């Protein structure tokens, strides 16, 4: 339930896959509004990316607990066997959004108290983290893949770091583009979308690499196939002896 068939090397694989191979922004284009609006300066993009990674990691963990102990199939069976058939799945989506909004509000208060400059730089886009589809999408992706708890935490962290990496890369390029001679009709959103597409194409080179599968399952499968082959060969030897 907490680690499942995943080993520590599998957790590293999940993190790398969520960050680079299946980058939540560059492969699914979730969270594009904040990505385009807050990437004109590297410092602002870095602060927003760090905030998104923090919110996604913590809310992903909390929402996993809610799914497995409250709203998921047979989730209430830990309270009483009589409650096992109660279905609260209709509350799941709104509950996830409430958790994300509540933690975003807490983060906003902390930034206002301890990092006033970053709070002012992010402006209206800080509370909009609550409705950033990348955060809700990351939570839903992890739950639909039936990750145990620790792999879910690592996947949420990797997805958040992937979003952070994408916006930092884009902000770095945009600062260079500010001094470039760009055709008039491509200035603004035009060159931004072209740049994002080129970054996404670079990450597409990693498509097809899967390093997040649990090794325990593959070991069990290989052991089972070995035992089957041994049984088959033994049966063949027995039948040949009978014929002789």
From Swiss-Prot:
GO terms for cellular component: Gram-negative-bacterium-type cell wall; plasma membrane. The keyword Membrane applies. GO terms for biological process: respiratory electron transport chain; sodium ion transport. It is a multi-pass membrane protein. It comes from the Bacteria. It catalyses: a ubiquinone + n Na(+)(in) + NADH + H(+) = a ubiquinol + n Na(+)(out) + NAD(+). Its EC number is 7.2.1.1. InterPro entries: NqrDE/RnfAE (IPR003667), NqrDE/RnfAE_oxidrdctase (IPR050133), NqrE (IPR010967). Keywords: Cell inner membrane, Cell membrane, Ion transport, Membrane, NAD, Sodium, Sodium transport, Translocase, Transmembrane, Transmembrane helix, Transport, Ubiquinone. Its main location: membrane. Composed of six subunits; NqrA, NqrB, NqrC, NqrD, NqrE and NqrF. NCBIfam families: nqrE, PRK01061.1. PANTHER family: INTEGRAL MEMBRANE PROTEIN OF SOXR-REDUCING COMPLEX, NA(+)-TRANSLOCATING NADH-QUINONE REDUCTASE SUBUNIT E. Belongs to the NqrDE/RnfAE family. This is Na(+)-translocating NADH-quinone reductase subunit E. The lineage of its organism: Bacteria, Pseudomonadati, Chlamydiota, Chlamydiia, Chlamydiales. The gene is nqrE.
């Amino acid at each position: 339930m907490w680690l499942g068939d995943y080993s520590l090397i599998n957790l590293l694989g999940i993190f790398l896959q969520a960050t680079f191979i299946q980058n939540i922004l560059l492969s699914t284009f979730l969270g594009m509004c904040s990505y385009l609006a807050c990437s004109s300066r590297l410092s602002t993009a870095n602060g927003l990316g760090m905030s998104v990674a923090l919110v996604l990691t913590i809310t992903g963990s909390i929402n996993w607990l809610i799914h497995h102990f409250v709203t998921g199939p047979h989730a209430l069976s830990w309270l009483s066997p009589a409650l096992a058939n109660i279905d609260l799945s209709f509350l799941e989506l709104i509950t996830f959004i409430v958790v994300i909004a509540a933690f975003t509000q807490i983060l906003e208060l902390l930034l206002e108290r301890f990092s006033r400059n970053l709070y002012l730089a992010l402006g209206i886009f800080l509370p909009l983290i609550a409705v950033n589809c990348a955060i809700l999408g990351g939570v839903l992706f992890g739950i639909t893949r039936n990750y145990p708890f620790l792999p879910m935490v690592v996947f949420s962290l990797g997805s958040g770091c992937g979003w952070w990496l994408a916006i930092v890369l884009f902000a770095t390029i945009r600062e260079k583009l500010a001094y470039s001679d760009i055709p008039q009709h491509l200035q603004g959103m035009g060159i931004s979308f072209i740049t994002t597409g080129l970054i996404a194409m670079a990450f597409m080179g990693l498509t097809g690499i899967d390093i997040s599968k649990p090794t325990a399952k593959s070991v069990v499968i290989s052991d089972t196939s070995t035992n089957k082959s041994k049984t088959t060969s033994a049966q063949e030897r027995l039948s040949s002896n009978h014929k002789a």
